[in-house]
Each structure stands twice: as structure tokens, then as C-alpha cells.
A protein has these predicted regions:
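Divalent metal-coordination and catalytic microenvironments
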Residues: 1, 6, 19, 35, ...
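Core catalytic region of metal-dependent phosphoesterases/phosphodiesterases
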Residues: 1-51, 60, 133
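Active-site environment of divalent metal-dependent phosphoester hydrolases
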Residues: 9-14, 36-43, 73-76, 107-112, ...
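Short, electropositive alpha-helical surface patch
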Residues: 15-29, 119-128, 155-164
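Short acidic-hydrophobic surface loop/beta-edge motif
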Residues: 55-61, 149-153
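Active-site-proximal beta-strand elements of phosphoester/diester hydrolases
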Residues: 62-71, 101-104, 156-162, 198-199
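His/acidic metal-ligating clusters that form di-metal
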Residues: 77-159, 193-195
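Binuclear metal-dependent phosphoesterase catalytic core
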Residues: 130, 149-204
Length: 204
């Protein structure tokens, strides 16, 4: 399971422990990355204990999956630091995997929503260019936007997933929520580098 940030709403250690308790019965490895609403110092102790991991990587078949931190201090928008870009490059270069999926919280491309695009990834162009230099990156997956997104950027699939809470109205100039229910996404990463995906909307 990949959790692309904003794990909790109230900034307490107990909230992260509650998240952990809710996930454990699924009996899955849970890869977590921080979102702009997360408090890293509270999140790490909980999400570094197996079967959870924090900004980690894993090789599954022909794929390498890497979680990176795109959060910036005191900024709802994000930035992938030079150190984090170098960490990503080192992980990819040391892996024999044929295909790479990178997970982050903030969208590296505009969403076409005036207010939401002010809190995207500040260095999205730089981030995408670095992904292209790594050559094996096939997919970048993100959260943050509370809506569906699926497009391609110079051969790299860019996918955003709706929230497991409430959704934002697509294309809106100002903050607005819509009536869509919570959702999650299933991903099938195939040996030839292709990607099959399905959105699952969860009715109450």
C-alpha cells in the first residue's frame, strides 16, 4: 500500500498511532510519505516501524518504487530538495530494476485550478527533468489535490488520486469541494513497463 501524505488531520502522536491501528488489520506493507499537513517528527516514529516505512524504496519484480519527500517548511506548496533529488538518483542507479515508480505528495504539473496551482510543487519542471535523466522512470504518483489526474509528460505517466476523505472541485478558481465520495487507486505494474490502473470510489 502507498500512502501519499496527509495521513491525519489533527497534529498529535495519538492520531498517527490511530492511523497505524486502522491499517494493521490489512496485513500489508504500508509505504508512507509526508504531506503538507503531516508533522514529520510525529510521523516518523510511527511510520518507521514495520510493516510501515517512511520515504523508503522497494523492488517488486521488474519495478523499483521510491517514496520521496516533497514538503517544504511552513508552505502548503512543495519543493523536492537537491539532497532528495540526489537520494532518488542514487537509489535508482543502484537498482537493477527495469522500471521505476516515484511517489510524492505534491503534483509536479498544474491541475488547471487557479487556487490549487498556487500550492503545487514549486520546482515541478526541475523535478520532471531530473526524472527524464534517470531514463527508467515510467510513473510519478502524487496526492494533495483531492481529485483524479492521469496524463503523460514526455513518456512518463503522471497520476494523481482522489482523497480518502472529501474531494476538491476540478478546475475551480477558488477553494470548493464537490460531491464525489472518498476513493483509492489500484495500480498494476507490468513487467513490460506498462501500467494498468483503476479508481475505486467508496460509497458510505
Amino acid at each position: 500500500m502507498l500512502v501519499t501524505g496527509d495521513l491525519i488531520q489533527d497534529d498529535t502522536p495519538e492520531a498517527y498511532e490511530r492511523f497505524r491501528e486502522l491499517m494493521l488489520p490489512l496485513d500489508l506493507r504500508v509505504h508512507c510519505i509526508p504531506g503538507n499537513h503531516d508533522i514529520r517528527d510525529l510521523m516518523r516514529p510511527v511510520c518507521c516501524r514495520p510493516p510501515f516505512s517512511y520515504c523508503a524504496w522497494e523492488e517488486i519484480g521488474d519495478w523499483l518504487i521510491v517514496g520521496i519527500d516533497s514538503c517544504a517548511e511552513e508552505d502548503a506548496g512543495g519543493r523536492v530538495t537537491i539532497d532528495e533529488l540526489e537520494r532518488l538518483a542514487e537509489i535508482v542507479s543502484s537498482s537493477p530494476a527495469k522500471h521505476v515508480m516515484v511517489c510524492l505528495h505534491h503534483p509536479p504539473v498544474p491541475m488547471g485550478s487557479k487556487w490549487l496551482d498556487t500550492v503545487g510543487l514549486r520546482n515541478g519542471d526541475e523535478f520532471l527533468e531530473r526524472l527524464h535523466t534517470l531514463e527508467r522512470v515510467r510513473l510519478a504518483a502524487f496526492g494533495h489535490v483531492h481529485q483524479e489526474y492521469d496524463a503523460e509528460h514526455k513518456g512518463i505517466r503522471i497520476i494523481g488520486t482522489p482523497s480518502t476523505c472529501r474531494q476538491f472541485q476540478r478546475g475551480s478558481d477558488d477553494f470548493a469541494v464537490d460531491e464525489n465520495p472518498p476513493a483509492y487507486r489500484r495500480l498494476e505494474l507490468l513487467a513490460d513497463g506498462s501500467i494498468h490502473t483503476e479508481l475505486v470510489w467508496v460509497s458510505e
